[in-house]
């Protein structure tokens, strides 16, 4: 007879000393992702996962609360130093960076990776209020 081995449902958490933070900020939402130096995702959070819906996902407060949730997950993992990459023109950029500065994690670099077209596709019409 064959024995069936039980698989453990608990994942082993690996301590990550250096982390890469990617902040993708659009007008509708801000997504904050933490990866290790190889690009494997450790944790992520966004305005939508924090309970904000609709237009409130794009606010700086939603970005700040998502960032604070991610910081808590990073501190549990034992992360000490981080590199930050910021992408997009949204309002959550500055508040996310400010939250990381006050968190106690050592910021090694902040890089802006927003792509700018060399007269590519036509942008959408101007927003009407």
Curated annotation (Swiss-Prot):
One of its GO terms (biological process) is translation. PROSITE patterns: RIBOSOMAL_S11 (PS00054). The keyword Glycoprotein does not apply. The lineage of its organism: Eukaryota, Rhodophyta, Bangiophyceae, Cyanidiales, Cyanidiaceae. The keyword rRNA-binding applies. It comes from the Eukaryota. Signal peptide: none annotated. Pfam families: Ribosomal_S11. It is found in: Plastid, Chloroplast. InterPro entries: Ribosomal_uS11, Ribosomal_uS11_bac-type, Ribosomal_uS11_CS, Ribosomal_uS11_sf. Its main location: plastid. GO terms for molecular function: rRNA binding; structural constituent of ribosome. Belongs to the universal ribosomal protein uS11 family. This is Small ribosomal subunit protein uS11c. Part of the 30S ribosomal subunit. GO terms for cellular component: chloroplast; ribonucleoprotein complex; ribosome. It comes from Cyanidium caldarium (Red alga). Keywords: Chloroplast, Plastid, Ribonucleoprotein, Ribosomal protein, RNA-binding, rRNA-binding.
């Amino acid at each position: 007879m064959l024995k069936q081995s039980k698989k453990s449902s608990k994942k082993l958490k690996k301590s990550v000393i250096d982390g890469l933070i990617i902040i993708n900020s659009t007008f509708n939402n801000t997504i904050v992702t933490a990866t290790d130096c190889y690009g494997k995702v450790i944790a992520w959070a966004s305005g939508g996962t924090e309970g904000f819906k609709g237009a409130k996902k794009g606010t700086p407060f939603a970005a700040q609360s998502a960032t604070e949730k991610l910081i808590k997950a990073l501190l549990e993992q034992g992360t000490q130093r981080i590199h930050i990459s910021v992408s997009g023109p949204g309002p959550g950029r500055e508040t996310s960076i400010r939250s990381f500065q006050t968190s106690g994690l050592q910021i090694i670099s902040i890089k802006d990776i927003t792509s700018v077209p060399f007269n590519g596709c036509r942008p959408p019409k101007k927003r009407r209020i």
